[in-house]
From Swiss-Prot:
Keyword Oxidoreductase: yes
Protein name (record): Sarcosine oxidase subunit gamma
E.C. no: 1.5.3.24
Comment field (misc): Utilization of tetrahydrofolate is probably the physiological reaction since the products are substrates for serine hydroxymethyltransferase, an enzyme which is part of the sarcosine oxidase operon.
UniProt-recorded Gene Ontology molecular function terms: sarcosine oxidase activity
Length: 203
């Protein structure tokens, strides 16, 4: 008799850059520039009009408030953070396993707004180290100077000719969020751009 076996989804899931982990490690240089994937981060799309009941409910439920200025990130990379994408559009990011989408749906109730689990929509890559801005500047048109792009700011820009979300999470660390389908292209470009920092400069 045939039998059915249920397999835990977590045992078979694969992150967009899982197969590139070794290449990212080999392309990284300790103390200079490093690249890794933040796998399976919880990502929730939120839409609500500022001033509405839905906005107030979601702002309270997410625990960080919802940012109301271009580029502002509410919260921090250590916990839940909310990135401003537009006047009524936001992306909440939380650690793997967070039940954020369900919590926000419950909080929204019948108020106007939208909550959507987007965890599979984008990959999350972390580029860190003192040379990280030099790598990004090779293809990113945004002004990355600290006076213009401070810690905990995030923007929509391009990198390697594809659209990405770029979030400065620390003085020397950045989150890069390309669409999942562009992850491999982005990683290979970053590894190539990092290659000049792999060896000590010739005196």
């Amino acid at each position: 008799m045939a039998s059915n076996t249920l397999i835990e989804s977590t045992s078979v899931r694969r992150s967009p850059a899982e197969h590139l982990a070794e290449a990212m490690a080999q392309g990284s240089t300790a103390g200079t520039v490093q690249l890794r994937e933040i796998a399976f981060a919880t990502q929730v799309g939120v839409r609500a009009v500022p001033g509405s009941g839905g906005f107030a409910a979601l702002a309270e439920a997410v625990g960080t408030g919802l940012p109301q200025q271009v580029g502002v990130v509410a919260g921090s990379v250590e916990g839940t953070a909310v990135l401003w994408l537009g006047p009524d559009e936001f992306l909440a990011i939380a650690p793997e396993g967070a039940e954020l989408a369900a919590e926000l749906v419950a909080a929204l109730g019948d108020e106007p707004g939208q909550v959507l689990d987007l965890s599979a929509n984008r990959s999350v890559l972390e580029l860190s180290g003192p040379a990280a801005p030099l790598v990004l500047r090779k293809s990113c048109p945004a002004d990355l100077h600290p006076r213009a792009f401070g810690v905990n700011l995030a923007i929509t820009t391009t990198l390697a000719n594809i659209p990405v979300l770029l979030w400065r999470t620390g003085e020397q660390s950045w989150y890069i969020l390309p669409r999942a389908s562009f992850t491999e292209h982005t990683v290979h470009w970053l590894i190539d751009a990092m290659s000049e920092f792999a060896s000590e400069p010739v005196a």
